[in-house]
């Protein structure tokens, strides 16, 4: 399940500024900076705990998710995958306090080799990921998940930094494909008939990239005949994050899954790096390679 974050079109004059020459600790693992915002991976357990607090504020307090009792008591969104994932952060350095107080956005990143050595991919609890990965023995997958940004930071620059970090991470670890669950609000797929049908008819992952919702969780996405689809209305009904993935060149798995705990209807994003639109590679790729050497 992924919270919807503000999407944007790339603007040529909005440049991601590379890290300034400050202290070695400040710049350790830094993927990029725009103004007072910067992106990097969490460096310690305190920062991961703070990211879990941000997730709780978005998923529970805002989106009305129902987490296990211990998570609700601690006011943290956490699960078994947190201990093996890398946690991408966006921090606002203008906020006074420690780094934990400055976290305003986060993404959870899981590499294939780490997933296979531990709990598998989170999205495999909803979709047949094993079959997808097995058809690509020479490719390396990474999972994106638990994306969220605090309401007051849902701006172009915050999302640019999150994608800057995602791309830099993918380049650093030589990833070939990105996967992950993206969400529609609510637990009634029929309420999103236009958008789900558009994904089914226009962006369905097929052939070697096919991935299907688990049989016991499968909900049909083909709810409106292709000849009856109004493209404009379908796109207007699409959550921003999903439209963002579409612009990058993503495909989507077959079937939606209702996640009652998070009060969402999930679809599977399948994004081969080779399919990412060229202008995005140019925009994010050059900067990522330059920062990471």
From Swiss-Prot:
GO terms for biological process: lipid metabolic process. Disulfide bonds: none annotated. Disruption phenotype: Deletion mutant is unable to produce ornithine lipids. Mutant promotes earlier tumor formation on the plant host. InterPro entries: Acyl_CoA_acyltransferase (IPR016181), Ornithine_N-alpha-AT (IPR052351). Keywords: Acyltransferase, Lipid biosynthesis, Lipid metabolism, Transferase. GO terms for molecular function: ornithine-acyl [acyl carrier protein] N-acyltransferase activity. It is an enzyme of class 2 (transferase). It catalyses: a (3R)-hydroxyacyl-[ACP] + L-ornithine = a lyso-ornithine lipid + holo-[ACP] + H(+). It comes from the Bacteria. Catalyzes the first step in the biosynthesis of ornithine lipids, which are phosphorus-free membrane lipids. Catalyzes the 3-hydroxyacyl-acyl carrier protein-dependent acylation of ornithine to form lyso-ornithine lipid (LOL). Belongs to the acetyltransferase family. OlsB subfamily. This is L-ornithine N(alpha)-acyltransferase.
């Amino acid at each position: 399940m992924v919270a919807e974050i503000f999407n944007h079109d790339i603007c040529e004059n909005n440049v991601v500024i590379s890290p300034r020459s400050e202290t070695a600790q400040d710049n350790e693992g830094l993927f990029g900076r725009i103004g007072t915002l910067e992106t990097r991976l969490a460096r310690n357990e305190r920062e991961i705990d703070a990211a879990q607090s941000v997730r709780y504020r978005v998923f529970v307090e805002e989106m009305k998710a129902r987490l296990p009792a211990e998570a609700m008591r601690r006011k943290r969104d956490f699960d078994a995958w947190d201990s093996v994932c890398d946690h991408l952060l966006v921090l606002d350095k203008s906020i006074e306090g420690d780094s934990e107080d400055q976290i305003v956005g986060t993404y959870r990143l899981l590499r294939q080799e780490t997933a296979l050595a531990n709990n598998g991919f989170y999205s495999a609890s909803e979709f047949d990921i094993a079959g997808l990965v097995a058809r690509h023995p020479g490719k390396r997958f990474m999972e994106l998940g638990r994306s969220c940004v605090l309401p007051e930071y849902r701006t172009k620059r915050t999302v640019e930094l999150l994608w800057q970090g995602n791309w830099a991470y993918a380049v650093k670890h030589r990833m070939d494909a990105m996967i992950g669950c993206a969400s529609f609000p609510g637990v009634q797929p029929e309420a999103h008939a236009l958008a789900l049908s558009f994904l089914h008819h226009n962006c369905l992952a097929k052939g070697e990239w096919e991935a299907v919702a688990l049989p016991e969780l499968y909900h049909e996405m083909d709810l409106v005949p292709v000849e009856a689809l109004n493209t404009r209305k379908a796109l207007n009904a699409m959550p921003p994050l999903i439209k963002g993935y579409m612009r990058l060149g993503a495909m989507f798995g077959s079937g939606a899954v209702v996640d009652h705990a998070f009060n969402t209807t999930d679809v599977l994003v399948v994004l081969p790096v080779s399919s990412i639109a060229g202008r995005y590679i140019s925009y994010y790729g050059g900067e990522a390679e330059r920062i990471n050497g």
